[in-house]
Amino acid sequence: MKNFSIAKSRRLRSTPYTSRIEKQGVTAYTIYNHMLLPAAFGSIEDSYKHLKEHVQIWDVAAERQVEISGKDSAELVQLMTCRDLSKSKIGRCYYCPIIDENGNLVNDPVVLKLDENKWWISIADSDVIFFAKGLASGHKFDVKIVEPVVDIMAIQGPKSFALMEKVFGKKITELKFFGFDYFDFEGTKHLIARSGWSKQGGYEVYVENTQSGQKLYDHLFEVGKEFNVGPGCPNLIERIESALLSYGNDFDNNDNPFECGFDQYVSLDSDINFLGKEKLKEIKLKGPQKKLRGVKIDIKEISLTGSKNIYDENNNVIGELRSACYSPHFQKVIGIAMIKKSHWEASQGFKIQINDNTINGNVCDLPFI
């Protein structure tokens, strides 16, 4: 499938930064939570190298928030996730797989505890707000559920710390990973978390004041010149090498947390109540029959739309390739695949059909780097 233009419509939301990134040379978008998400600024490989050496500003406003508040908000948030939040603290972020009644994944958001009775669920690409509203209605919870006007910009890369210190002062460098606090920019307070969808380090600014956020975006580029700041976006190569999983690509509502390696976030032994708990107990007892694994494929390029079956030497399907890219580090194609138990051990060989050619590959551990 070739890249193609996206038709404008009321259903397709732009972001407060769209006009800026278009001037900065965005070359591709994807759709994420019904909103434009930049997918490329020229060469993905060049952007990958820049991200790992310098600092980038990302328009990730498509990472929408589901705000849940009210006296039953903590009970509802806990019902949605298999992770025990009973000891969660204000000012912290928590990676929280959201589970349905069958024990399958609905989303894998980061949950921010703003107050004892106020939470933001920073979602991946699915309509979590309707899931939350359905549970709230069915359980008659006293909560308010809205999508607030919050447009995240991310500052990512090894030089992000120096850039953010220059703008916000020494205090911001003291934020611990997955911690957040409020920082002033020209008289406006912004919630800033030490987080982001890369493993190169950085921050995410949860912009509630659009005008101030746009000024901050421009200011970061102005004062970031000495750090070789550039525009960017979540990078396919970096995320696959780092095994940063993508809902809708690497896993979806047909998969459960044990198949995706989320065991540490599944609290089956605590007395908390969450949807699908008994189903997950059954799944754990039986053991998963497939798992997400890394793969290395002996080719130099790949264009993946959807998924591709993986075969053993007897042409039996043993899994499917779900994400893939050429890795400059390994000088071959690497990917994330769902592999059957019989073939998920590292170094297990397989075959895959690409452009009418049979290519050999091997299973490996995640992350790659």
UniProtKB/Swiss-Prot annotation:
It holds the Pfam family GCV_T_C. Optimum pH is 7.0-8.0. InterPro entries: GCST_C, GCV_T_N, GcvT/YgfZ/DmdA, GcvT/YgfZ_C, TrmE/GcvT_dom1. It is an enzyme of class 2 (transferase). One of its GO terms (molecular function) is methyltransferase activity. Its EC number is 2.1.1.269. Keywords: Methyltransferase, Transferase. Non-competitively inhibited by MMPA, weakly inhibited by substrate analogs dimethylsulfoniobutanoate and dimethylsulfoniopentanoate. It is used as an intracellular osmolyte. One of its GO terms (biological process) is methylation. It catalyses: S,S-dimethyl-beta-propiothetin + (6S)-5,6,7,8-tetrahydrofolate = 3-(methylsulfanyl)propanoate + (6S)-5-methyl-5,6,7,8-tetrahydrofolate + H(+). It comes from the Bacteria. (6S)-5,6,7,8-tetrahydrofolate binds at S122, E204, Y206. Homodimer. Belongs to the GcvT family. DmdA subfamily. Major contributor to the demethylation of dimethylsulfoniopropionate (DMSP). Demethylates DMSP to methyl-mercaptopropionate (MMPA). DMSP is used as an intracellular osmolyte, predator deterrent and antioxidant. This is Dimethylsulfoniopropionate demethylase DmdA. It comes from Pelagibacter ubique (strain HTCC1062). The gene is dmdA.
